Amino acid sequence: MKKGAVLNSDISSVISRLGHTDTLVVCDAGLPVPSSTTRIDMALTQGVPSFMQVLDVVTREMQVEAAILATEIKEHNPQLHETLLSHIEQLQQHQGNTIEIRYTTHEHFKKLTADSQAVIRSGECSPYANVILCAGVTF
């Protein structure tokens, strides 16, 4: 459910259409996007925009009740993992709910993206900088 204003019309549109438990992916520049899934490509060049920049804007608009991460992020990108967990903690406080964090293998994560409403590709070029956001409700 939308909570504010996003300038990108594709992102705004997909968020406004989300129902409870629908998913939306924010990913790095390297994650393969299934041909059956809508791709919203924000990547301009390596690192622009960053994963966290895209995630920050998306979560200003989207009510989130769960987040799915690849287990591999813990070992291969611990700094981003900590930044992401901190962001989710702040989002919980802002939304007034608990956001469940789930982990799965990267291979399974890639399969889950096929069921997503869209995949938003950032310019991030660090490993496992991907999250599946599960939509909540604002009431």
Curated annotation (Swiss-Prot):
Membrane-crossing residue ranges in chain numbering: none
Main location group: cytoplasm
Active-site feature positions: H20
Annotated compartments: Cytoplasm
Single GO biological process annotation from the record: D-ribose catabolic process
Pathway(s) this gene product operates in, as recorded in its UniProt entry: Carbohydrate metabolism; D-ribose degradation; D-ribose 5-phosphate from beta-D-ribopyranose: step 1/2
Binding site for substrate: D28, H106, Y128, A129, N130
UniProt xrefs under InterPro entries: D-ribose_pyranase, RbsD-like_sf, RbsD_FucU
A Gene Ontology cellular-component term: cytosol
The protein's enzyme class: isomerase
Pfam family, one: RbsD_FucU
Family: Belongs to the RbsD / FucU family. RbsD subfamily.
HAMAP family with a match to the protein in the record: D_rib_pyranase (MF_01661)
Cited function: Catalyzes the interconversion of beta-pyran and beta-furan forms of D-ribose.
NCBIfam families xref list: PRK11797.1 (NF008761)
PANTHER family from the UniProt entry: D-RIBOSE PYRANASE
Protein name as catalogued: D-ribose pyranase
Organism, as annotated: Citrobacter koseri (strain ATCC BAA-895 / CDC 4225-83 / SGSC4696)
Gene this protein is translated from: rbsD
